[in-house]
Structures are given as structure tokens and as C-alpha cells.
Amino acid sequence: MAAAVLTMTAFQGGQAQAAAKGAKKPKAAPAAPAPAAADGKRIFTTTCAACHQASGEGLGEQYPPLVGSEWVSDDEAKMVRIILHGLTGPVDVAGQTFSGAMPAWGAILKDQDIAAVATYVRGAWGNKSAPVSAASVKTIRSATLARTTPWTVAEQALVKK
């Protein structure tokens, strides 16, 4: 009978913990899930689709497609740097040159928002690139914090992965 009696042994964080002989320790909370696809799609729709279109196919000669783009499937850091700080000057995508400038979103979007939209784009419309984590965005943001101007294609080529 004594083994069945629970005793209050500690109060942590305002919650009582009961201990009993043979009781198992509680499991750690599971890790936070990757950014939800719905969040990425919502952010894309409100911040990116006006130029890149809901279909990801871009617009005319100004805004490049994201469908099958090497800028999407390449190193995730390149895409994150562009979302954070923008891109200016001509850019070649799928053999076509585009002249529109990409605005910087780093001052507006949080790390988890950038991770969500990058993950969405990297997995939408037949793209099959790995998800981007908020931790990765945070690292890239910290490494480029002093940057105040949009990237150019030439500068992106010089940045090591």
C-alpha cells in the first residue's frame, strides 16, 4: 500500500510533481515542427506572388520564375540572403535574363517566416529541395547583419556556402 501512496516532492514552474516508487520520468517535449507549408504559402501569396505569380512562373522579362530555378534549388543560403537583403541588376534564370529588382524582406519578415516561405518555394511547383530552418535563417541573418544594400549576381557568386 505504501508503494501506491504518492508524495509531493517538488514544485517546479508552479506545477507539483508527484513521485511514486517505480514511476517513470516524463519524456522531453518533442522538437518544434518545421515551418508549416500553409504558413509558407500564405507568406508567398502576400509578399511574393505579385512579382513571381501564384504559379511561380514569374512575370514577363522583369520577374524570374521560381519553378525549376537554380536560384531556388541551389544552396539554401543564397536564397535566404536574397530574401533578407534583396537582389539588384540583371539575373539569368533558365537561359533568360530578367531585369526586375527583388526587394529586401529582412526588416519585415521574422526568421521563421523566411524559413517558411523559402521551404514552401523550394518544395512547390515540382521543386524538390530541402526545407530551410529558422535556425539556418538566423545564422545567415547574423552573418550578413551589416549589409545595407541588395546583393548582385556577381556578389552572390563570391559568397562561400
Model-derived regions, located:
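Sec-dependent N-terminal signal peptides
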Residues: M1-A16
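Sequence/structural segment immediately N-terminal to covalent heme-attachment motifs in c-type
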Residues: P33-L59, V72-H85
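Cys/His/Pro-rich metal-binding microdomains
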Residues: A49, P64, P103
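Short amphipathic alpha-helical interaction/hinge segments
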Residues: G56-L59, L87, V91, S129, ...
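Extracytoplasmic electron-transfer domains, predominantly the class I c-type cytochrome c fold
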Residues: G68-P131
